[in-house]
UniProtKB/Swiss-Prot annotation:
Annotated Cd(2+) 2 binding sites: C18, C23, C37, C40
UniProt protein name: Metallothionein 20-III isoform B
Induction: By cadmium.
Binding site for Cd(2+) 5: C46, C50, C52, C56
Residues that hold Cd(2+) 3 according to the record: C25, C29, C31, C40
Residues the entry annotates as binding Cd(2+) 4: C44, C56, C62, C70
Functional summary from the UniProt entry: The metallothioneins are involved in the cellular sequestration of toxic metal ions.
Lineage: Eukaryota, Metazoa, Spiralia, Lophotrochozoa, Mollusca
Binding site for Cd(2+) 6: C52, C64, C68, C70
């Protein structure tokens, strides 16, 4: 559904064919919009068709596109 922006548990691997944009390993595992990542335990999803920002690392500090909310 949405991008996987999450806290790393082991290693961050963005899904096949996904852009490496926003993808980091360390404190957080972040993949480009529409991509999934493995080795994660916290996922932020924005409502509807909205995308989460690259700095989203979980429900407590989730930032979504204007006019959208996080779950």
């Amino acid at each position: 559904p949405g991008p996987c922006n999450c806290i790393e548990t082991n290693v961050c691997i963005c899904g096949t064919g996904c852009s490496g944009k926003c993808c980091q390993c360390g404190d957080a595992c972040k993949c480009a919009s529409g991509c999934g990542c493995s080795g994660c335990k916290v996922v932020c999803r924005c409502s509807g068709t909205c995308a989460c920002g690259c700095d989203c690392t979980g429900p407590t500090n989730c930032k979504c596109d204007s006019g959208c909310s996080c779950k």
